[in-house]
Amino acid sequence: MKCFAQIVVLLLVIAFSHGAVITGVCDRDAQCGSGTCCAASAFSRNIRFCVPLGNNGEECHPASHKVPYNGKRLSSLCPCNTGLTCSKSGEKSQCS
């Protein structure tokens, strides 16, 4: 049982270490793969995940920074994929 507790503590330390990227959790775009950005969680701006860039017809944020962005994104939406723009469509914006 003591060994199990030590393993759990070790995994928690690794998961919350600065710069650790586990299961898509990130801090900056550079930690994500091609075609993705490091977007804020819709539930907490302190948690960010690697999210795919927007495709045609998908929701976007018109003021989103280009990829790669060196700062921390505040939006839960990535910018549109190459060749697409984020345009207002009704009350929401979409990649087109």
UniProtKB/Swiss-Prot annotation:
Q: Which cysteines are joined by disulfide bonds?
A: 26-38, 32-50, 37-78, 60-86, 80-95
The UniProt transmembrane annotation reads none
Tissue specificity annotation: Expressed by the skin glands.
Cellular component GO terms, alphabetically? extracellular region
**Signal peptide (UniProt feature, chain positions):** 1-19
Cellular compartment(s): Secreted
Main localization, broad class: secreted
Entry superkingdom: Eukaryota
Which GO BP terms apply? endothelial cell proliferation
State the Gene Ontology terms under molecular function: toxin activity
Q: What does this protein do?
A: Potent agonist for both PKR1/PROKR1 and PKR2/PROKR2, and inducer of a potent and long-lasting hyperalgesia. Also potentiates capsaicin-induced TRPV1 current, when tested on DRG neurons. At subnanomolar concentrations, this protein both induces potent chemotaxis of macrophages and stimulates LPS-induced production of the pro-inflammatory cytokines IL-1 and IL-12. In vivo, potently stimulates the contraction of the guinea-pig gastrointestinal (GI) smooth muscle (nanomolar concentration).
UniProt record similarity statement: Belongs to the AVIT (prokineticin) family.
Q: Name it.
A: Prokineticin Bm8-d
